[in-house]
A protein has these predicted regions:
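Active-site helix of classical SDR
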Residues: 68, 104-107
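A short, exposed helix-loop element centered on a Lys and neighboring polar residues
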Residues: 68-69, 113
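Residue(s) in the substrate-gating loop at a strand-loop-helix junction
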Residues: 88
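A glycine-rich helix->loop->beta "capping" turn
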Residues: 1, 22-33, 41
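The beta1-alpha1 cofactor-binding region of Rossmann-like NAD(H)/NADP(H)-dependent oxidoreductases
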Residues: 8-18, 50
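SDR active-site lid
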Residues: 121-193
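Substrate-binding pocket helix/loop in short-chain dehydrogenase/reductase
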Residues: 44-45, 49-54
């Protein structure tokens, strides 16, 4: 009586609408939406197959948007609810071969950043969940795909990132069960972070990335400021 399994294809608007309706018919409400569907795509930018990239974005970005839009009317009516969008450490720091995947996750993060400000006055909360490397099936089967249009000039740089070339599968430090518990615990806390980064290595990576960005801003601050009108103009 407390669980309901439904079929949901985030690339299908009809599937999304039907799944949400089934949940409402069963429980009367949806208090928490977790957008966790997604997969990886490894490719140098030039190698990217546009249809594959469009499907990636449909799964990682547009599908979650459709789900958000499907649950918000009821959440607005009840003046409560939580929307958790799962992204990736890649959204903070893209790697070679991950530009398309990272950009889809970064787009979801920035969308959530705006969404949380729009929903706060309505009593609804939104948060980004940004996991690092976790011991899941991400590197197995269809969870990680790669371009079929490989270009030899990129092999030395991108080759190691291609599906099938990973040496540390199922040795990641992140424990998915612990991550799930942390997410549940945080949702029960009124003081939600904008971004909940998961994993010690992920926190270190984000800090390093932010420090590098600050250093770059400082280095180029004078050049950046030179574009402003002179005082009095």
């Amino acid at each position: 009586e407390t669980a309901l399994a439904v079929s949901l294809d985030v690339c299908s608007q009809d599937s999304i609408k039907n799944a949400v309706k089934e949940a409402y018919d069963k429980f009367g409400t949806i208090d928490v939406l977790v957008n966790n569907a997604g997969y990886g795509y490894r490719s140098a930018v030039e190698e990217g197959e546009i249809e594959a990239v469009q499907t990636l974005y449909q799964t990682n970005l547009f599908g979650p948007i459709e789900l958000i839009k499907a649950v918000l009317p009821k959440m607005r009516e009840q003046k409560s609810g939580y929307i958790l969008n799962v992204t990736s450490i890649a959204a903070a720091r893209s790697a070679v071969g991950s530009g398309y995947y990272a950009s889809s996750k970064a787009a979801l993060e920035l969308l959530t950043n705006g969404l949380m400000k729009e929903l706060a006055p309505l009593g609804i909360k939104a948060m980004v969940v940004q996991p690092g490397a976790f011991r899941t099936r991400f590197y197995d089967g269809e969870s990680l795909q790669g371009t079929k249009a490989q270009i030899g000039d990129y092999e030395a740089v991108v080759g190691k990132s291609r599906p099938g070339n990973f040496e540390n599968k199922h040795q990641q430090a992140g424990d998915p069960d612990k991550a799930g518990k942390v997410i549940v615990d945080v949702v029960h806390n009124d003081d939600l972070p904008e971004i909940l980064t998961l994993g010690k290595a992920a926190v270190t990576a984000v800090k390093s990335t932010l420090e590098a960005k600050i250093a770059e801003l400082d280095k180029w601050a004078e050049v950046s400021a030179s574009c402003d009108y002179d005082e009095g103009e």
